[in-house]
């Protein structure tokens, strides 16, 4: 995980979701799920987790059990210092519990239609074809 973290920090920088949205004008959304099933999955973005660091959310999204271990999320304080985000919780890829949280996204952004591209190869056996 250390190499992945270094790669992400080098390429994504130390940006929070709020900073990334301000810099790009884009709404980045990353779905993560708690490793402990007693909590609900989250959508991390500039509205729900403005101070969470994007690289830590990407790490959590890569944490597929057996391949990568669950991780803690990191946020950035007003003074630039890093601090744990929900420190008692470790996070994994959102597809473990809620791959594409369409209803939450619709409420957050007041949208009626969604176009999504599924790029997770491990989910293919569970997909249903419209032609069947």
Where are these regions (language model features)?
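Patatin-like phospholipase
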Residues: 1-132
């Amino acid at each position: 995980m250390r190499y992945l973290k270094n790669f992400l920090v080098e390429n994504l920088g130390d940006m929070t979701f709020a900073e990334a949205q301000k810099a790009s004008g884009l709404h980045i959304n990353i779905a993560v799920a708690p490793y402990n099933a007693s909590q609900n999955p989250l959508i991390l973005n500039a509205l729900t987790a403005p101070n969470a660091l994007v690289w830590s959310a990407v790490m959590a999204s890569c944490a597929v059990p057996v391949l990568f271990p669950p991780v803690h999320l990191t946020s950035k304080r007003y003074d630039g210092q890093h601090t744990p985000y929900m420190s008692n919780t470790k996070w994994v890829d959102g597809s473990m519990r809620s791959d594409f949280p369409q209803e939450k996204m619709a409420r957050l952004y007041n949208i009626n239609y969604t176009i999504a591209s599924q790029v997770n190869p491990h989910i293919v056996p569970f997909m249903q074809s419209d032609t069947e």
